[in-house]
Each structure stands twice: as C-alpha cells, then as structure tokens.
C-alpha cells in the first residue's frame, strides 16, 4: 500500500463555489494527473 499526498490549485469559473470546483477537479484530475509545473512544485516546498 502507498499513501499519496497531493496538492491542487483550483481556479473556479465565475459563479461556481470553490468547494464544488475543488471536488470536480479532484474527480477529473485523475484523468489528467500529471498537470504539474515548476511553479506549483516550488509552492509545495513548504509542506516538506
């Protein structure tokens, strides 16, 4: 078994509550899991 901690930055469309956009992104994010950038990696350094 493996535990994975993932962080996503979500920008909801106008009129969409952030928690709904986040839930949709997590669901759909597994299809496009490797959307990663150096900027996002640097932002996650604080969690190490």
Swiss-Prot record:
<dbReference type="InterPro" id="IPR036422">
    <property type="entry name" value="RuBisCO_lsu_N_sf"/>
</dbReference>
<keyword id="KW-0503">Monooxygenase</keyword>
<keyword id="KW-0934">Plastid</keyword>
<keyword id="KW-0456">Lyase</keyword>
<keyword id="KW-0150">Chloroplast</keyword>
<comment type="subunit">
    <text>Heterohexadecamer of 8 large chains and 8 small chains.</text>
</comment>
<comment type="similarity">
    <text>Belongs to the RuBisCO large chain family. Type I subfamily.</text>
</comment>
<comment type="function">
    <text>RuBisCO catalyzes two reactions: the carboxylation of D-ribulose 1,5-bisphosphate, the primary event in carbon dioxide fixation, as well as the oxidative fragmentation of the pentose substrate in the photorespiration process. Both reactions occur simultaneously and in competition at the same active site.</text>
</comment>
<dbReference type="GO" id="GO:0009853">
    <property type="term" value="P:photorespiration"/>
</dbReference>
<keyword id="KW-0120">Carbon dioxide fixation</keyword>
<dbReference type="GO" id="GO:0009507">
    <property type="term" value="C:chloroplast"/>
</dbReference>
<keyword id="KW-0113">Calvin cycle</keyword>
<keyword id="KW-0346">Stress response</keyword>
<keyword id="KW-0560">Oxidoreductase</keyword>
<keyword id="KW-0601">Photorespiration</keyword>
<keyword id="KW-0602">Photosynthesis</keyword>
<dbReference type="GO" id="GO:0004497">
    <property type="term" value="F:monooxygenase activity"/>
</dbReference>
<protein>
    <recommendedName>
        <fullName>Ribulose bisphosphate carboxylase large chain</fullName>
        <ecNumber>4.1.1.39</ecNumber>
    </recommendedName>
</protein>
<dbReference type="GO" id="GO:0016984">
    <property type="term" value="F:ribulose-bisphosphate carboxylase activity"/>
</dbReference>
<dbReference type="GO" id="GO:0019253">
    <property type="term" value="P:reductive pentose-phosphate cycle"/>
</dbReference>
